[in-house]
Curated annotation (Swiss-Prot):
The gene is SLC22A12. It comes from the Eukaryota. Glycans are attached at N56, N102. Changing G290C: In some gout patients; uncertain significance. Changing R90H: In RHUC1; strongly reduced urate transport. One of its GO terms (biological process) is cellular response to insulin stimulus. This is Solute carrier family 22 member 12.
Length: 553
């Protein structure tokens, strides 16, 4: 018997799978808080230069008479581009002439100002502390904030490259357990980082482990669940991220100090580390690596949890050995990336699906990690992202079944891109409309993620499927790294980053229309199967055109 029959024997969808899905889904929710954390821990508070007349009590006492704080601000800090107090410059000397009601903007010149040589004063009414205020990541150092986010996302990229081979060699559960511990330790260490480069290093190592959690969570769910239930289980796993957005907003609303917030979202992974020892190692991996005794013990344990303890009498080492031989005989030799890119039809599919993966990572992380640019209440925005993400993903699943893969993916990307582009035309003062369009756009990106995850698996043959999907996921992570850096274009115009974020999914959505439809088609196992599907489609199209021509009056 094949492994799928062994899984049905011990229970492919029972109490064990329910408990396993719940346990892993909890860790995914807390993992999402780490990825979205810097919306709050790295929020940029309102700030201005430190000025003696405003912030030095001795200087204030030397002023004859009494001046209001507004008057002291006017003679100490020049107006900025938005006519509010400048965030990065101050007057070299108090401009007393500005107290004259007849004073104008020409009463002072740029030469009368200087950078914030004595530091900044931050508004602490919303957040008592952020990494931006701690290390002064503003003005000339403002690029360091998106750089820190890109370093975190680069850690996920590097971790994915390392954790995949590690889990194939040492096992899924062992790498997952280590990743939980590494996330807990590195997250806790980041809270006490003495300097910004050290903080970035700890966040990079934390993100390295994030990749291990994401990859091995999905693998364990897939390898312990019957084929008929895998779409449901993987959708629930994906919804863990949706619930994680709401959890992030709730925790950040209650904890306004970045150090404590970093601790609160890191400590739960110590608990995940402890209960991960209960999780079963993948029996499929154990069998294919020759660990028959361990694999038998895990299968017996799962059978007992699922109420099928009697199978121990029939599930013997000989049966396992037979299953392993059959499973290996059914396998096919792996094909290389060169094969994927060498054949024109596969190369075309690879380029477009990779572009769609890139658009997801680039747009989602570019927008979702800078909520301050999308609206005034970032707590509600973070909550709404999770609320909208749930129906977006569920709706995408329904449309994939009824409308088809190609139109659903294209529509999701086009919706996301058009909502983002529309935001470039909305005045900054219309915060509610800007927030609504941004959340709707992110919902479209979430739907596109569901589509491309399923669609890309159906576009490629079995011998190349993991290579193609892995390439797409690498493109998504590469896009995620670039996404935050595009915000630096905002110095040339606040609309420019949104223009880039909106254009990429629109172009990807249009390109997706060129892909073949795979709805109701069997999964191709070989490259020849893909070619046969293309020939059938071309033949069907030719016959269809002939029928239409023959029935015209």
């Amino acid at each position: 018997m094949a492994f799928s029959e062994l899984l049905d024997l011990v229970g492919g969808l029972g109490r064990f799978q329910v408990l396993q899905t719940m346990a892993l889904m909890v860790s995914i929710m807390w993992l999402c808080t780490q990825s979205m954390l810097e919306n709050f821990s790295a929020a940029v508070p309102s700030h201005r230069c430190w000025a003696p007349l405003l912030d030095n009590s001795t200087a204030q006492a030397s002023i004859l008479g009494s001046l209001s704080p507004e008057a002291l601000l006017a003679i100490s800090i020049p107006p900025g581009p938005n006519q509010r107090p400048h965030q990065c410059r101050r007057f070299r000397q108090p401009q007393w002439q500005l107290l004259d009601p007849n004073a104008t903007a020409t009463s002072w010149s740029e030469a009368d100002t200087e950078p914030c040589v004595d530091g900044w004063v931050y508004d602490r009414s919303i957040f008592t502390s952020t990494i931006v205020a701690k290390w002064n990541l503003v003005c000339d150092s403002h690029a360091l904030k998106p750089m820190a986010q890109s370093i975190y996302l680069a850690g996920i990229l590097v971790g994915a490259a390392a954790c995949g081979p590690a889990s194939d060699r040492f096992g899924r559960r062992l790498v997952l357990t280590w990743s939980y511990l590494q996330m807990a330790v590195m997250g806790t260490a980041a809270a006490f980082a003495p300097a910004f480069p050290v903080y970035c290093l700890f966040r990079f190592l934390l993100a390295f482990a994030v990749a291990g959690v994401m990859m091995n969570t999905g693998t364990l769910l897939m390898e312990w669940t019957a084929a008929r239930a895998r779409p449901l289980v993987m959708t629930l796993n994906s919804l863990g991220f949706s619930f994680g957005h709401g959890l992030t907003a709730a925790v950040a609303y209650g904890v306004r100090d970045w150090t404590l917030l970093q601790l609160v979202v890191s400590v739960p992974f110590f608990l995940c580390f402890l209960y991960s020892w209960w999780l079963a190692e993948s029996a499929r991996w154990l069998l294919t690596t020759g660990r028959l005794d361990w694999g038998l013990q895990e299968l017996w344990r799962v059978a007992a949890i699922n109420g099928k303890g009697a199978v121990q009498d029939t599930l013997t080492p000989e049966v396992l050995l037979s299953a392993m031989r059959e499973e290996l005989s059914m396998g096919q030799p792996p094909a290389s990336l060169g094969t994927l890119l060498r054949m024109p039809g596969l190369r075309f599919r690879t380029c477009i699906s990779t572009l769609c993966w890139f658009a997801f990572g680039f747009t989602f992380f570019g927008l979702a990690l800078d909520l301050q640019a999308l609206g005034s209440n970032i707590f509600l925005l973070q909550m709404f992202i999770g609320v909208v993400d749930i129906p977006a993903k569920m709706g995408a699943l329904l449309l994939l079944s009824h409308l088809g893969r190609r139109p659903t993916l294209a529509a999701s990307l086009l919706l996301a891109g058009l909502c983002i582009l529309a935001n470039t035309l909305v005045p900054h003062e219309m915060g509610a409309l800007r927030s609504a369009l941004a959340v709707l756009g992110l919902g479209g990106v979430g739907a596109a993620f569901t589509c491309i995850t399923i669609y890309s698996s159906e576009l490629f043959p079995t011998v190349l499927r993991m290579t193609a999907v892995g390439l797409g996921q690498m493109a998504a992570r590469g896009g995620a790294i670039l996404g935050p850096l595009v915000r630096l274009l905002g110095v040339h115009g606040p609309w420019l980053p949104l223009l880039v974020y909106g254009t990429v999914p629109v172009l990807s959505g249009l390109a997706a229309l060129l892909l073949p439809e795979t709805q109701s088609l069997p999964l191709p196992d070989t490259i020849q199967d893909v070619q046969n599907q293309a020939v059938k489609k071309a033949t069907h199209g030719t016959l269809g055109n002939s029928v239409l021509k023959s029935t015209q009056f």
